[in-house]
């Protein structure tokens, strides 16, 4: 029996709250600050976001990887997540690095922000675990100012458990990402960037582009995807 929306999100949030303290220690999730991969991520995010300073929302921020890079680049950043444990880790990282970003509880499908208040919305390693992606992208578009952009960075999983290592040890991933949960996450099963492009176009964005981050993939110590990360972008007219 398919799970209802609330039960799906509860399982997802519980999983990421459990793994939050160890999330950054896995190189497939977050590269070390001094690594060539981290430098490459800074360059990529700088290229993908509008000129600074811009109002940026990082959806599914987790431990704040993208938010903190955007802050470092000079943007005004809000990162939202439903895992309080992940947000706590993000705040620790911000304090440790002397960076300013606002981290708050927020549902990715219906972010708690005013309409027409943002210049960019970005998410990384998140689309695959987003319920109701079609609804979410429509709602994201409403938050953007004219000419605001959406940036979706993700990839296609090697298999349904590789991305969660080492957290998957002991079957933790399968206990929370049950068959019923997976059925409610359509992008988890996608294997084509064309589907991602169709998602962004279907939400009403124009000038939709899809590219890859092959340069970062080559530098990654333990990339979570067999193929390079993809980047889908779109503009609100």
Regions found by a protein language model. Name each.
Residues 1-52, 168, 214:
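Conserved class I S-adenosyl-L-methionine
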Residues 120-133:
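A short SAM/SAH-binding and catalytic strip from SAM-dependent methyltransferases
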Residues 134-146:
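A short glycine-rich, Lys/Arg-flanked "PGG" loop and its adjoining helix->strand segment in the class I
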Residues 55-59, 63-110:
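Class I SAM-dependent methyltransferase SAM/SAH-binding core
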Residues 53-55, 116:
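Nucleotide donor/acceptor-binding cores
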Residues 109-121:
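A short acidic, Gly/Pro-enriched loop at the edge of an enzyme's catalytic core
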Residues 220-237:
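Core SAM-dependent methyltransferase catalytic element
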Residues 10, 153-222:
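C-terminal alpha-helical "lid/dimerization" subdomain adjacent to the S-adenosyl-L-methionine
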């Amino acid at each position: 029996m398919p799970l209802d929306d609330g039960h799906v999100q509860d399982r997802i949030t519980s999983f990421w709250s459990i793994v939050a303290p160890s999330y950054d220690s896995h190189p497939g999730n977050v590269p070390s600050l001094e690594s060539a991969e981290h430098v490459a991520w800074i360059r990529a995010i700088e290229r993908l976001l509008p000129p600074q300073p811009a109002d940026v929302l990082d959806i599914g921020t987790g431990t704040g990887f993208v938010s903190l890079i955007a802050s470092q680049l000079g943007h005004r950043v809000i990162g939202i997540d439903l895992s309080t444990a992940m947000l706590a880790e993000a705040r620790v990282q911000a304090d440790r690095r002397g960076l300013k970003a606002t981290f708050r509880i927020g549902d990715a499908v219906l972010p708690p922000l005013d309409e027409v208040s943002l210049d960019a919305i970005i998410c990384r390693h998140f689309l695959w675990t987003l319920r109701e992606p079609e609804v979410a992208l429509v709602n994201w578009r409403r938050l953007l100012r004219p000419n605001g952009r959406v940036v979706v960075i993700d990839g296609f999983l090697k298999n349904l458990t590789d991305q969660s290592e080492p957290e998957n040890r002991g079957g933790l991933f399968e206990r929370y990402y049950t068959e019923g949960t997976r059925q409610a996450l359509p992008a988890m099963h996608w294997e084509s960037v064309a589907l991602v492009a169709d998602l962004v176009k279907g939400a009403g964005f124009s000038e939709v582009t899809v590219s890859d981050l092959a340069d970062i993939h080559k530098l990654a110590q333990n990339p979570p995807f067999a193929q390079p990360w993809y980047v889908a972008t779109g503009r609100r007219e």
